[in-house]
Amino acid sequence: MARHCELTGKKANNAFSISHSHRRTKRLQHANLQWKRIWWEEGKRWVKLRLSTKAIKTLEKKGLASMAKEAGINLNQY
C-alpha cells in the first residue's frame, strides 16, 4: 500500500540530511500517517482509512462524507 493520506493525498517530501560538515544526502520526510477507524453515518458502519493527522483534525470539523466527496472516494470500497 502506498504511503499517502487517502483523503488529502499527502505524501512524502524530498529533503536533505545535512551533517556537521554540511554534506547533504537526500532523504524523505514522510507524512504523519495513522490508521483510523471512523464511523460512517450514511453507511451505518465503521470505515478504516490511513489518514494524516491534519486530515483527522479536519474530519472533526467537516465530517467524513463531505471530505470523501471532495477527494472523490467511494466509501463503500473500504
Swiss-Prot record:
* Sample GO molecular function, one term: structural constituent of ribosome
What's the short name of a Pfam family annotated to this entry? Ribosomal_L28
InterPro entries recorded = Ribosomal_bL28, Ribosomal_bL28/bL31-like_sf, Ribosomal_bL28_bact-type, Ribosomal_bL28_sf
A Gene Ontology annotation in the biological process aspect, one of them, is:
translation
Kindly indicate whether the keyword Ribosomal protein belongs to this entry: yes
Q: Which GO terms describe its cellular component?
A: ribonucleoprotein complex; ribosome
Family, as annotated: Belongs to the bacterial ribosomal protein bL28 family.
**What is the protein name stated in its UniProt record?**
Large ribosomal subunit protein bL28
Q: Which gene is annotated as encoding this protein in its UniProt record?
A: rpmB
